[in-house]
């Protein structure tokens, strides 16, 4: 596994980070609660958290070093058909010839129809080495967005929608560039 990581890192050094689009899925539900709270001196902060997770959401997103390229959320698990629809309807129009679509190794990412779709616009599919979320800048974005969702404590789909898009709006170009750099992509000064 270590050799695969080293090979991946070496191969990515020859690619301009501006040509790398990173895609990943994340999940959330309606029980998100902030990890931090304030209380008067001598009292413990109480943060009620629903016991029933209620509706669960899957979020699919793609980023570049400059911006969030595409995002979609649904109230079910992502499968091959949903993933294909995301690529075809939302992401494909943003991919350019010579770009690389970087994804993890989940089975439905590896479908031949996904590869053909991406290659139809002149882009290439690249997979992260196994167990390497630390090489994926979008993981850092999901972390920031989920912290913002927690602060809003959504309990309805409308509240979740607002919290998600507030979190996404708070992601800056500086964040994205820093996350690419933290993941080892050589960002020009």
Q: What label would you give each PLM region?
A:
Residues 17-20, 138-189:
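C-terminal anion-handling pockets and recognition modules
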Residues 22-24, 61, 87, 104, ...:
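Mobile genetic element proteins and their domesticated derivatives, centered on retroelements
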Residues 45-52, 121-137:
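RNase H-like polynucleotidyl transferase catalytic core
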Residues 82-100:
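Short, basic/hydrophobic alpha-helical segments
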Residues 26-29, 64-68, 107-109, 132-133, ...:
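Short, solvent-exposed loop/turn segments at secondary-structure junctions
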Residues 2-88, 184-185:
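Extended, low-complexity cationic-aromatic segments
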Residues 97-110, 136:
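Acidic/histidine-rich, metal-coordinating catalytic segments
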Residues 22-23, 99-103, 127-129, 180:
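Short beta-strand segments
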